[in-house]
């Protein structure tokens, strides 16, 4: 965390958070996550990629709790973080553990494979399959999965697969990587 680009970006984020009336960048990001949740709760659609898919839920489940390492906000992580996480606030995931070590390239145990322990697969093994949906009964997932192919190749990256045990029961799954637990 000593690279000049990192220090510059950190200063920019802190300046913007203060300008918008927040005491810290984590507070600002949690407020934005709540705005996004409200948008979705009111019928809006959300398409998220990469770390956005799980970082929303981490932010929402830790509203009012210091879950950010001191390197990010200058204050210590709440010592009772694990017991204070409120999964009822999250959109799609539950019962996950948050990874707070800033030296580990991972946020939680939601995604599979974990970003800090990537399983490198060749081009033929790097794919996921979309499920079929009825346009009559399921118009939204039908629209979102219309790619004219049933298998999407070469799409794996940070947070593109999820541990099924961490997905809330009401979440509609539109595709799968059969190697995911």
Residue ranges, per PLM feature:
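General N-terminal targeting signals
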Residues: 63-64, 73, 110, 115
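Short, surface-exposed basic-aromatic patches at helix termini and helix-loop junctions that form
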Residues: 38-41, 60-66
């Amino acid at each position: 965390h000593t690279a000049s680009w990192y220090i510059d970006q950190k200063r920019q984020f802190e300046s913007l958070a203060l300008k918008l009336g927040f005491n810290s960048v984590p507070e600002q990001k949690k407020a934005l996550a709540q705005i996004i949740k409200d948008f979705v709760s009111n019928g809006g659609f959300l398409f998220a990629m990469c770390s956005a898919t799980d970082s929303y839920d981490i932010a929402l489940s830790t509203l009012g709790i210091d879950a950010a390492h001191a390197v990010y906000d200058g204050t210590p992580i709440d010592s009772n973080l694990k017991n204070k996480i409120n999964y009822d606030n999250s959109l799609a995931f539950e019962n996950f553990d948050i990874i707070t070590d800033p030296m580990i390239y991972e946020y939680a145990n939601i995604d599979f494979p974990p970003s800090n322990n990537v399983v490198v697969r060749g081009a033929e093994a790097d794919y996921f399959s979309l499920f079929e949906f009825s346009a009559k009964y399921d118009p939204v997932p039908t629209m979102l999965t219309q790619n004219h192919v049933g298998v999407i190749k070469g799409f794996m990256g940070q947070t593109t697969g999820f541990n099924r045990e961490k997905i809330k029961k009401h979440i509609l799954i539109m595709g799968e990587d059969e190697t995911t637990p």
